[in-house]
Amino acid sequence: LTIAYGQRHVIEVERARQVAAALGASKHTIISLDLRTIGGSALTSEFEVPKDRISSGQRQGIPITYVPGRNLIFLSLAAAHAEVLGASLIYFGANVLDYSGYPDCRPEFLQAFEQAVMKGTKAGVEGKPLHIRAPLLEMTKADIIRKGLQLGAPLHLTHSCYDPIGTLACGRCD
């Protein structure tokens, strides 16, 4: 499942399509919604994406790259999709160790969301719970790359940049 949410880094959606194809996904659903109408983030508005913030001391408060409600919305869509498919697990790529200050990338958010899904979905009420798995949550970015290499993941197809220059990462954003 990929969500095109009006992000300035739309290359992310194309790369997700390529990764799904490379991994032989039987189905790759792309949901489009436009969070630019809400605004409030450098990823969906005209605010400048912060660059060169190397030390955690430079990071105070919730950064301008936080998209209000993004992961809440994404996980809600994933839960609805999983319920329709009859799936019991949702895998989510949140990471807390290289924490950017996003409140919706914390373990307590994921635990609370899973509880909400248990109480607010047909699957949960009928005793077929949906569980959230975030295997990258406690890994550093370097550990994530190492694990990807170990698993033979098509890392050359991935994209992780908020302010790309064409198809290339800027090398300076968070």
State each model region's role.
Residues 1-152:
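ATP-dependent adenylation/nucleotidyltransferase module used to activate substrates
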Residues 76, 159-174:
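Local cysteine-cluster metal-coordination motifs and their immediate loop/turn environment
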Residues 155-157:
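Short hydrophobic/aromatic-enriched beta-strand-loop microsegments
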